[in-house]
Design a protein with these regions (language model features):
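Right-handed parallel beta-helix
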Residues: 8, 50-61, 89-105, 128-152, ...
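Right-handed parallel beta-helix/beta-spiral solenoid domain characteristic of secreted/periplasmic
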Residues: 1-70, 103-109
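A generic structural signal for short, non-catalytic loop/turn and secondary-structure boundary residues
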Residues: 6, 94, 111-113
Length: 166
């Protein structure tokens, strides 16, 4: 569990465009022009994490990048919280509670890589035969305030299994 302690203001994570990692769905998405891999910035990254609770934090990701424009198509995707399922089969019991996520300045054009306040997605496992399908069982989001985030507020996004849905 990650939680505040004591009294006073919430502990604050100010990522400022740092926390850079590489997202890769493991193959093209449903349209060849959709972005399926690339670098992005997250304040909190839960990568193949389960049985975890993140509570009572203030989270921002508002970088100071010289000459970066809001309408710039190649602007970096940014999140407050990214949750990724990939190499551990079914991920259980992920709780986000009483988070104040704001001023996450992502890419307004890209809706495929994680981008926004809270964003969850599923990537192709390195060895699906061994791990099973990557998925979630028990996502709980309670009492979170998400504001001034680009592109999404809270989203359960793309999956490498997109072709199974019609």
């Amino acid at each position: 569990m990650v939680d505040a302690y004591g009294e006073g203001a919430l502990p604050r994570i100010e990522t400022d465009g740092n926390g850079i990692w590489y997202q890769n769905y493991g193959g093209h998405l449903d349209n060849v022009v959709h972005t399926w891999k690339g670098y992005l910035s997250s304040a909190v990254l839960l990568y193949d994490a389960e049985y975890i609770s993140i509570r009572n934090l203030e989270i921002t990701n508002n970088p100071c990048v010289k000459n970066e424009r809001l309408n710039q198509a190649d602007r970096m995707n940014r999140t407050g919280v990214s949750v990724i399922a990939k190499n551990h089969g079914t991920l259980h019991e992920i709780e986000l509670d009483h988070l104040y996520i704001h001023d996450v300045e992502g890419n307004i054009y890209d809706k495929h890589l994680n981008n926004g306040g809270i964003y969850m997605s599923v990537s192709r496992p390195d060895d699906e035969e061994k791990t099973g399908i990557a998925r979630y069982d028990g996502i709980h989001i309670h009492h979170c305030k998400v504001e001034n985030c680009r592109r999404w507020g809270i989203a359960a996004g793309y999956t490498y299994q997109h072709d199974k849905f019609t």
